[in-house]
Amino acid sequence: MSPQTETKASVGFKAGVKEYKLTYYTPDYETKDTDILAAFRVTPQPGVPPEEAGAAVAAESSTGTWTTVWTDGLTSLDRYKGRCYHIEPVPGEESQFIAYVAYPLDLFEEGSVTNMFTSIVGNVFGFKALRALRLEDLRIPPAYVKTFQGPPHGIQVERDKLNKYGRPLLGCTIKPKLGLSAKNYGRAVYECLRGGLDFTKDDENVNSQPFMRWRDRFVFCAEALYKAQAETGEIKGHYLNATAGTCEEMNKRAVFARELGVPIVMHDYLTGGFTANTSLAHYCRDNGLLLHIHRAMHAVIDRQKNHGIHFRVLAKALRMSGGDHIHAGTVVGKLEGERDITSGFVDLLRDDFVKKDRSRGIYFTQDWVSLPGVLPVASGGIHVWHMPALTEIFGDDSVLQFGGGTLGHPWGNAPGAVANRVALEACVQARNEGRDLAREGNDIIREASKWSPELAA
């Protein structure tokens, strides 16, 4: 090597790990109306100060990397960087903190939940300085909300399409979820809808298996709901699961559902992905289909208390991506869910404006401007004796979905549906008359059972 090109190790650029808090911890920062705000539950590694941990989250989820790079000088770091602007301890937890991070709106592609999540949670959860990290909440500014279509139709349009007002809607997941032939599956759909339910549903893992291909299921379910409609005079629906291995196949199934004239299709939005879900939501709006969303895989992401993403964030993401219904727990059934926390994200799904309320887990005031609302679906281990509590907790703008609570009736599927419809009508009437569902719920069901042998069974 010539003297002119020889390089010694002691000469030239020296890379080194920098302290993130020098650049990304800015406690004096005043948040802007256009910032996306995030609340992270941070558990730093021993010896890592909370300010450094919070700054690391802000850096790694925005413009930062582990060292200074030459190209930092080619952009306006101050304009584009995320900022950790506040840190507070978690009550009762010595080593956990809530780190509040503000992100400039220009960091995100318009109308893309995929890009938003890739930026905010895509890489930082594996960061060495953190023992655990959980995204507790996001504040989506109106300027970003307005770049999304959101739910294909929303609550009021759905009620108008179905001509159903003044009560929760009733549904049922067909069981067993796997193994039925398409014809027997359609028979169960007919019996439930004929008995008085508004909807029946494919389970989340019913796609197109050898025992029941999707096209056969769609045809027999459409036949069942048209027959039930003709006999009851009510508009009925079955959530036809369009989830598939490719977006092209998913779209093909949605097109076939539209050609059959059914009112609603379904998608597993977490396993299917946000890009696929948003594409399907756009198709549903353009073609008059309602879209039911199942949250399969959510507990992998949201169940741990100190690591992952809280469901309220996933619920907000769904409202942006698009869906007319989404499963939201039950409070009283077989699946985990606290009442105050559940009511918090139910309001975030339905309401136009939700104020900050830490007692319900809402870290930021959220203004959805004109984005349509989403109906929460209560599903999982519920039956007629839960009806008073469900009616009180979820109110009219909800779907109460009973699987085993319908199909497990000793007299069969149709009597199970009758029992659910009678129980719901009794609870709604009692509530409208001023009775206390929480205190008198069991008495209301017992009184109704005197006039309904199906409910008394």
Swiss-Prot record:
Annotated positions for site Transition state stabilizer: K334
GO cellular component, one term: chloroplast
Positions contributing to substrate binding: N123, T173, K177, R295, H327, S379
Catalytic activity annotation: 2 (2R)-3-phosphoglycerate + 2 H(+) = D-ribulose 1,5-bisphosphate + CO2 + H2O; D-ribulose 1,5-bisphosphate + O2 = 2-phosphoglycolate + (2R)-3-phosphoglycerate + 2 H(+)
Sorted UniProt keywords: Acetylation, Calvin cycle, Carbon dioxide fixation, Chloroplast, Disulfide bond, Lyase, Magnesium, Metal-binding, Methylation, Monooxygenase, Oxidoreductase, Photorespiration, Photosynthesis, Plastid
Modified residues (N6-carboxylysine): K201
Cofactor, how bound (note): Binds 1 Mg(2+) ion per subunit.
Membrane spanning residue stretches: none
Subcellular location: Plastid, Chloroplast
InterPro entries: RuBisCO, RuBisCo_large_chain_AS, RuBisCO_lsu_C, RuBisCO_lsu_C_sf, RuBisCO_lsu_fd_N, RuBisCO_lsu_N_sf, RuBisCO_lsuI
One of the GO biological process terms: photorespiration
Keyword Cell cycle in record: no
Post-translational modification, as annotated: The disulfide bond which can form in the large chain dimeric partners within the hexadecamer appears to be associated with oxidative stress and protein turnover.
Propeptide, chain numbering: 1-2
UniProt GO molecular function: magnesium ion binding; monooxygenase activity; ribulose-bisphosphate carboxylase activity
Residues recorded with modification N-acetylproline: P3
Residues with N6,N6,N6-trimethyllysine modification: K14
Origin superkingdom: Eukaryota
Quaternary state and interactors: Heterohexadecamer of 8 large chains and 8 small chains; disulfide-linked. The disulfide link is formed within the large subunit homodimers.
PANTHER family associated with the record: RIBULOSE BISPHOSPHATE CARBOXYLASE (PTHR42704), RIBULOSE BISPHOSPHATE CARBOXYLASE LARGE CHAIN (PTHR42704:SF15)
Miscellaneous comment: The basic functional RuBisCO is composed of a large chain homodimer in a 'head-to-tail' conformation. In form I RuBisCO this homodimer is arranged in a barrel-like tetramer with the small subunits forming a tetrameric 'cap' on each end of the 'barrel'.
Purpose: RuBisCO catalyzes two reactions: the carboxylation of D-ribulose 1,5-bisphosphate, the primary event in carbon dioxide fixation, as well as the oxidative fragmentation of the pentose substrate in the photorespiration process. Both reactions occur simultaneously and in competition at the same active site.
Annotated protein name in UniProt: Ribulose bisphosphate carboxylase large chain
Organism expressing this protein natively: Phelline comosa
